[in-house]
């Protein structure tokens, strides 16, 4: 992913699932497969808050779900992880856009993740 802040706009009246597709890319000369792990990482948000003078909070884990591992096989240079948000519960519980999901991407021992592309912060904004 890009190291930045992503906004997922969601129309609660749409009846559709609230899903963010996080695209992961494999680069370099690595023909072997690699498994990367997605980890909720509050330290990513801590840095972002300090750098931007904000007080965003980590979204409680009951409001989202994702597969923590993504496998990029040897010939596959890109895959996506589906981050699913429970928009109905978020609305019912008053979880607003001050709550975000900070994620880090970590590689297994077969590779490494470029520091400038190893994290993302996702905010869900209800329309």
What are these model-predicted stretches?
Residues 68-77, 81-92:
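Short, hydrophobic beta-strand segments
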Residues 1-61, 65, 78, 90-102, ...:
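Acidic/polar, low-complexity intrinsically disordered N-terminal segments immediately downstream
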